Design a protein with these regions (language model features):
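C-terminal cap of thioredoxin/glutaredoxin-like
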Residues: 2-48, 175-253
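A general structural signal for short secondary-structure boundary/capping elements
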Residues: 58-60, 127, 158-160, 183-184
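Short low-complexity stretches enriched in small and charged residues
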Residues: 39-41, 66-72, 110, 168-176
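Functionally engaged cysteine thiol sites
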Residues: 54-55, 138, 190, 223
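Structural alpha/beta surface segment adjacent to cysteine/selenocysteine redox centers
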Residues: 75, 83-85, 91-167, 171
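Short acidic/polar alpha-helix capping motifs at helix-coil junctions
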Residues: 5, 62-68, 139-140, 166-169
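Extracytoplasmic low-complexity, Pro/Thr/Ser/Ala/Gly-rich segments
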Residues: 46-108, 114-116, 124, 242-253
Length: 253
């Protein structure tokens, strides 16, 4: 008969003194570190190209060279743009300043926050402002790079309709332009379902925007005049970083 007092030795998993305990601690630490590395990699790669946005409905566009405030990841200069895709002044602004803003983004001088608002929609224009703005958010969900191309295309002379015109791009055309910008994915369903129509409807009021284009630099409204003046203003904030001297780019044709 076995002696009830003779029990098999127990392995104390909590004890750091035993060899097995030390192995468990080392293994657990390694797993935690590995998980952290994988998580950081996922966050960085997901944020890099997938849709993104900033706050209050803005689509944030940056580059990996972004000049940040010391000790933080916050940009030194944020240019906020509030635009309506049907607005003729917005078209003029983008064709005149768009290449320079894009260049400032690429050299890391600014983060650009694009808020596409609906001010000019009406049944007469098939609610184009709202549909185009909502489509831009659909594209941004899939790719920020594609959003940049889509945004530029919709303000081009060949595509932007006249505010008093009789024909306006339908959803099929917006989907085609999104495809040409480099995305398909969920964009067609997003556009056709009107996923972001209610969102864009209230963006102008939420930001207290009454006219487009409105441009702000670090939250203060900026009276734009020339691309050179814009570059000079940004240079005051971030300094003379590489590429700044050639950032004022010729207007788009």
């Amino acid at each position: 008969m076995a002696d009830k007092n003779k029990r098999p030795p127990r392995i104390d998993l909590k004890s750091p003194d035993g060899k097995f305990g030390r192995l468990m601690q080392i293994g657990g630490t390694a797993l935690v570190v590995l998980f952290a590395v994988v998580l950081v990699f996922y966050i960085v790669t997901s944020h890099d190209k997938k849709g993104g946005g900033a706050t209050a409905g803005a689509i944030r566009v940056t580059s990996s060279k972004l000049v940040a405030q010391p000790g933080t990841s916050n940009p030194k200069a944020v240019v906020s743009l509030y635009e309506d895709f049907l607005c003729p002044a917005c078209g003029n602004f983008e064709r005149g300043f768009g290449p320079t803003v894009s260049r400032l983004i690429d050299i890391g001088a600014i983060a650009a926050d694009y808020t596409m608002v609906d001010i000019l929609s009406s049944p007469r224009n098939d609610n184009y402002s709202a549909r185009a703005a909502a489509a831009a958010y659909c594209v941004a969900d899939e790719s920020i790079d594609a959003f940049r191309r889509f945004h530029t295309a919709l303000f081009s002379k060949d595509i932007q309709p006249s505010e008093v015109g009789k024909t306006f791009p339908d959803n099929a055309k917006l989907i085609e332009l999104a495809r040409e910008a480099g995305v398909v994915g969920k964009v067609p369903d997003c556009i056709n379902s009107g996923k972001y129509l209610s969102k864009v409807d209230g963006l102008a009021a939420a930001a207290n925007i009454h006219a487009t284009p409105t441009v702000k630099i670090n939250g203060t409204e900026y009276e734009w005049s020339t691309p050179e003046a814009l570059v000079a203003k940004i240079k005051e904030i971030v300094g003379d970083i590489p590429g700044m001297d050639t950032a004022a780019t010729a207007p788009a044709a």
